[in-house]
UniProtKB/Swiss-Prot annotation:
Belongs to the methyltransferase superfamily. RlmG family. Gene3D superfamilies: Vaccinia Virus protein VP39 (3.40.50.150). Specifically methylates the guanine in position 1835 (m2G1835) of 23S rRNA. GO terms for cellular component: cytoplasm. Its EC number is 2.1.1.174. Pfam families: MTS. Keywords: Cytoplasm, Methyltransferase, rRNA processing, S-adenosyl-L-methionine, Transferase. One of its GO terms (molecular function) is 23S rRNA (guanine(1835)-N(2))-methyltransferase activity. It catalyses: guanosine(1835) in 23S rRNA + S-adenosyl-L-methionine = N(2)-methylguanosine(1835) in 23S rRNA + S-adenosyl-L-homocysteine + H(+). It is found in: Cytoplasm. This is Ribosomal RNA large subunit methyltransferase G.
Amino acid sequence: MSHVDDGFRSLTLKRFPQTDDVNPLLAWEAADEYLLQQLDETEIRGPVLILNDTFGALSCALAEHSPYSIGDSYLSELGTRENLRHNGIAESSVTFLDSTADYPQAPGVVLIKVPKTLALLEQQLRALRKVVTAQTRIIAGAKARDIHTSTLELFEKVLGPTTTTLAWKKARLINCTFSHPQLANAPQTLSWKLEDTGWTIHNHANVFSRTGLDIGARFFMQHLPENLDGEIVDLGCGNGVIGLSLLAKNPQANVVFVDESPMAVDSSRLNVETNLPEAFERCEFMINNALSGVEPFRFNAVFCNPPFHQKHALTDNIAWEMFHHARRCLKINGELYIVANRHLDYFHKLKKIFGNCATIATNNKFVILKAVKQGRRR
């Protein structure tokens, strides 16, 4: 938990999920402060749009202006809602939209936290292009090291004249004025053929490894089990290639695709519809924080390629939460399979949670692990 006085409100903010006290990560950064410094409250006219507000620092500070918080992270929405409540601000003060929704027309102010993925930034700028005016104040912010020439060129190409500020506390801002430059249309998804399957994989802008099959998933797919039945989960599904493979290999099983990214879940749904339409009735698609709120003892197996970062921050908190949720939701003798970089040492984490762990396969970079939910552990 951390405190910030941004000139609009004095706030107490925390990350979601919370990090441990030994290695705490802040719920806000200098770019948030820098963005807010640019705004004199008397200047704010028309709707306020906030894009990629990681844990609600901007939304909480500007809550009296009833902002729209737009992004592709359910975790960020949960974190923002928690911080609104913690600071005594009504959750209804902020309207949450995902990035593929229609944005409000003629906003007065647009604040953008530059996302890690350039493709997501382009999708969001193209959506803004449809609603902003020459009078809209457009300001983006990030760590100085994360603003590149390609970032500035993208703003210039999609929206119009772009300048950048001097660095302040290692943060930098981008100012942009909309001038309606000519711009070719772009496809909604990026698609590629998945070798040895005949499948075409469709990827929305914020999907992990959207330009091709990542090597961890490739290794995982080579070792997926067959002859499973009941309900199984592709946890952190991304574009759904693991779940697709499980559907094909296990015709008696139903697959639940789960991710905190609406774009990932939409990509998974599209990929089942276009590649295995006959299996669609065996699927469920869920935008969620891991398996929060899912009943215990439901699933026969969970498959997971866990992230080890949240936005720009390296953390194993999300993976740790996924493992605990998986154990709670597995039936007795249900199995968790994960693929991970070898250096992350998830073997000992799984053994601590499940009381057991076995190595299924390994290569020079990745390891596939299996843990079984045993009845003697609660």
